[in-house]
Amino acid sequence: MSNEINLQEFKMHEKDSGSSSYQIARLTQRIAHLTEHLSTNKHDVSSRRGLLKMVALRRKLLDYVKREDMAQYQSLIQRLGLRR
C-alpha cells in the first residue's frame, strides 16, 4: 500500500488502542486497504458492505472529535489527508 499510516503517532500512550484519534487512524488504514481490494474485486459485495460500515463509523468518530476538541479534529484531518 502506498499510503502507509504510522499508527504510533496517533496513540496517546504506549498501550493506547481506544482513543478516538487512534481508532480513526486505524479505520482510515483499513478503509484504504479495502478500497484497494475492491478496485480489483468489483463483485465482492460483502467487503463493500463492510467498507461502508467502516466509513460510517469513522464519520461518527470524526463528528465526536469535532464536537469535543476542534483543534484535535483539524489536526486529524490534516495528518490523515481526509477531505472535510
Curated annotation (Swiss-Prot):
InterPro entries in UniProt: Ribosomal_uS15, Ribosomal_uS15_bac-type, uS15_NS1_RNA-bd_sf
Keywords noted in UniProt: Ribonucleoprotein, Ribosomal protein, RNA-binding, rRNA-binding
Organism: Akkermansia muciniphila (strain ATCC BAA-835 / DSM 22959 / JCM 33894 / BCRC 81048 / CCUG 64013 / CIP 107961 / Muc)
SMART domains the UniProt entry points to: Ribosomal_S15
Lineage per the UniProt record: Bacteria, Pseudomonadati, Verrucomicrobiota, Verrucomicrobiia, Verrucomicrobiales
Domain of life of the source: Bacteria
Subunit description: Part of the 30S ribosomal subunit. Forms a bridge to the 50S subunit in the 70S ribosome, contacting the 23S rRNA.
Gene Ontology molecular function, alphabetical: rRNA binding; structural constituent of ribosome
Full protein name: Small ribosomal subunit protein uS15
